[in-house]
């Protein structure tokens, strides 16, 4: 069962669904929900394969970045912002961007498989960076060039939004794992040096215990590298949600590593806790919602 279940359960129970914005950045099939489709050149289909070294045109990157910055400047200072993503192949673009920004991130980035395909991700990332004539572990690289070469549209939009909102003092919850670490790294690389401390103090990566405890990746070490690279204190927080006592096998499989994070699961679970509700109550709610979903006529249930 998709981790989107967690976000849906939280948003519905907390009455936040009307305040949720889904942004389509170029899906071949439009989301089956109310959403905002950005105009060209921001949304002109998916990015090309990162191995090409030409994932997006620079014009598209600049347009997405400026859109994010504009939204960040317009966001109310007294309203926290939660950013989530759903990007196919997103951990691969995350690794490629992190490498392009000069971080030794190989082996640290997670993935959707039970055991992340570190070798495959590294080969694709290195191939793309080489094709774009970008050095791995280089310092002083142009983050826009890295984004255009091996990034994805979400990263450009989210980095601009994180940069401007955080710099203005808006609390930003980067709901996710490796992909949101890459967004934070991009925001820090793009921001002027005198804004980075403020940015890092306001933007927090929020993930699940399943990802944080995964033996085949290391998000905490990834954040430590980001802290060292830009001389800030990158923040990571882990939600308490566990599914070990759920009735649904589909949810208990999270505890076995088959699902770890995605669609903002960790951030939404943390939002639930910040509202003063216990994590066990959210687990029970997800269990009931999962049972309803699996028994729905859409899936051939009763």
Predicted regions and their residues:
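N-terminal loops that bind phosphate or other acidic moieties
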Residues: 1-84, 88-302
